[in-house]
Amino acid sequence: MHIVKYSLEECLAKEATILDRLEEITINSLPIWRLVRNTFRRKIVDDNSRSTVPIIKVTDVLRNFFLSFFGLLKIVLLGKSYSNVFFPHSRLFLVSNQYLERFSDPLIDYSEIGEDYIILERPQNGTHNKPRYHGNKVIYLDFIEIITRICLPVAQQIVSRKYKNQIDLLCKLLNSQFEEANVWKYKVLFSKIVAERLLQYHLTKIVLTRLNPKRIFLAHRETFNYVIAYAKKKGVMTIELQHGITVGETVLYSGRYDARIDPDYFFIFGESNIGPQFSMPIERLRNVGYAYKNYITDIGLNRYPEHYVLAISEPRISDVMVNTLLLLAVSYPQYVIHIRCHPQEKLSEEMLDKISKYKNIEIVSNTYESFCALSQYSCIIGENSSVLYEAMSLHKKVGRINFNGLEVKETALIHGGFKINKVEDFETFMTKPYSDENDSKELYSDFKIENFKSIL
């Protein structure tokens, strides 16, 4: 069967014609459209990205289920309140022998909130990495996740009957614009999503009521929209933490701000991130900087000698990048080039064989978090990877390769670096004084405590 796909631009244009009516459809005052929007878009928008299927250990799931149960039970029984509750991103990184979440953990350290916080952590692929930074403040949400899965089949049947009119109207409206995609086939999926969110809402409500927070921090809004819904009803402030560089329209963020289900504030990494791309009113954006950047600088990781260079590669340019780096390695044997591949990038056997013939060029691990890796080098080179802008924010020398099939691209907000237009320019880059005057340093700025405190 032919599956109809739309470009994101087409999708957004079609949504806009029926958006007012979509937002009027509610269940318990929650806009159904916003509960299903992200999943619906991912079904119909043409997107080449792929995800891997994780291997989940049953023993890990069972152990974390009981740890979560007793942790949540303790919250309910003790009734201790915290002003700040964090729902972090599920992806953790190993830094200085501890796993941390880059967007919330350093923010906790630099924000001066002291011990007045608790972290409610969802599992990633059924596991929780240890040793965990701020581990004594972490409570697992596995119990809520698993109970939701167990109850979901029954809850879905109840939702599909009780809210049949609302779900039918949603499908009818969407099908009027996306008729080729036959939206009615997603009716069961929509009822499942609504049932899942309602279960998560009511289970999490018990915990949050006992915690009685003043503020809830989360990343990101689609994962935790049921938390935002609870907070809105209780008058609790919600703050979403930026979790990546976003430029232009995206499946996740594009749309109209809805105060019923969107966060009250959005913390951005730096001044250059201010814009409409997060679908937040500009006055609700707060440039608090990137506390993780301060954290990495302060812990002082070991550095390579000055003649070591880190090269940033990407799947789109693997072969061209390696061939270009080999040219540099042959021309300048006094420098050692370390190649860091993208996590989804796999070099061919031919490329690996070429690299193995040279002593001054090698592949280094890409499992090390990027800011940690960057902090160990003085010089970073690449083409257009966003990692180069992380390097600029750390005040590194950044060379951008602009020859041999590689082409530097810049925008008004994203720019900078020394352009390496030919092989000989590499020597100039390495030996001459570097000016960072034109570098995009404000994508990731230093943490700004005064901006954080401005909403407290």
Where are these regions (language model features)?
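Catalytic-core helical/loop segments in enzymes performing group transfer/polymerization on anionic/lipid-linked
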Residues: 1-456
